[in-house]
Amino acid sequence: AGTDPSGGAGAAADCKTFCAHGCFALNVITAVVSQNTQGVRGYMDVTPELIASQIDAVFEDIDVDAVKIGMVSVPETIRVIADKLKQYRPAFVVVDPVMVATSGHRLLAPEAEQTLKDVLLPLADVLTPNLPEAEVLTGKKIESFEDMEDAAKAIAAMGAKAVLVKGGHRIADATDVLFDGKDFHYYKGKRIESTSTHGTGCSLSSAIASNLANGMNLSDAVQAAKTYVFEGIAHAEPIGKGHGPIHHFYELYKKAGVQ
């Protein structure tokens, strides 16, 4: 994943989410991103050689139960990650196809879209596109539940074992649709009027990966992850001048009696 010096998205959100779920977080940085709650100012991709070295450093030393993949902005990054996934064969691979930041800044180069489809999607146990990302992947407008179902099936046909199309961007009750390769599952949610939505996609995909690593089945893993993000938004502290982060440790703070 990419970095976030403001701590709300990318590798920072991933690590917080894994830790909140009782997992030990490891991270491989794919891009150094200058961003905060107000937007992305710029980024620099890490070289494929250094990405490969980071992955080797992790897998050669520590047993990995699940992998979550976030920002992979150029074809070279995607290819080296795919090669390493084939080499190490982790049990679960969750891919969040990060294309556009909450602020609207594009994080996936246009020339990388086809590489993402051809090289990374077939290695994904779960893919978690939001509506704009699902539209890019399928080339079709999504305006209804039926469109979400069609998109999930179409993306699964590209190779992903399961696809969770997130409806929070447009669907009235924030319902998400999961296609597991055979059946559809629906996850209704309450829409919260909040600006604390920075890193929600990162946090959801990492929560799914955490839950799978902890032994949950896919349907339960998605439901628990959705609840985790909802509670994180509902109890978020007002941080920053723009779209602030969710409260990743709300449940732990509550148990510890921290206000």
Q: Which role fits each region the language model picked out?
A:
Residues C15, E135-V136, S194-L218:
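Short, small-residue alpha-helix embedded
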Residues D45, S219-Q259:
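Charged C-terminal helix
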